[in-house]
């Protein structure tokens, strides 16, 4: 692990969890060693790490390639374990090999070849996405599952909406556009007739190639109950600046057996969120223009 990698990870963790994350990060090598001795795996190199965790490659005692995921937020990790176990019958999420919420640790099988969906041939993707959704959505929501798509959107609109205070963003997206997205969202939520257990964060970076026998595998679920179209909307909106959202929407709706009108309506709801992300982190102007028109 290079110092630069750890510095970058440290900055992201501090951004998310506050200055205490630095002390936690310093203890990661010792924590990984303790868990390796307890669970019998061999620790490998640093794997890609997100804003809330550090991920290391490891080899399970039976030789299975695996990843060790560590987070200062044990409760968050426990929730992730629960969601992966709920979706396990679908065969379309990584298997949980071990977990300890108190230690903020879990070991998952590594998905191989593991190519992200955004790097797979675009022509076969709609069909494969359809197969993935069919498998995921066939899992019955647990009777007492507390998370709903409505709550997910309330949180997203509140959190992302704060960025409208940034002049660079308010110059492109006004309060009226944002309010229109909220109203469109309310209308779609009020007219949901089919409710399934959604992955809830199914963008092209959260779907990996599990090879010919397994198909596409979804990682990092934020499971909630709601309209099946929601698990295709990020993929559809990703058509902005390429073949176009409308064309991709038709293709994906057909391949996934979804209501094309509702899927397109959902894409208009999330379009301004994508614009804010592009303006914040950089994105093609052509896509921004198309998404602004979609949100109008």
Enumerate the predicted regions with their spans:
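Juxta-kinase regulatory segment immediately upstream of eukaryotic protein kinase catalytic domains
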Residues: 1-44
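Generic structural marker for isolated residues within well-ordered, non-membrane alpha-helices
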Residues: 10, 32, 84, 133, ...
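ATP/Mg2+ or Mg2+-diphosphate-binding catalytic cores
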Residues: 16-18, 166-168, 172, 247, ...
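An alpha-helical support segment within catalytic cores of ATP-dependent transferases
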Residues: 24-35, 138-200, 210-212
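A conserved alpha-helical element in kinase catalytic cores
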Residues: 29, 51, 62-107, 111-135, ...
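Active-site Asp-x-Gly
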Residues: 209-262
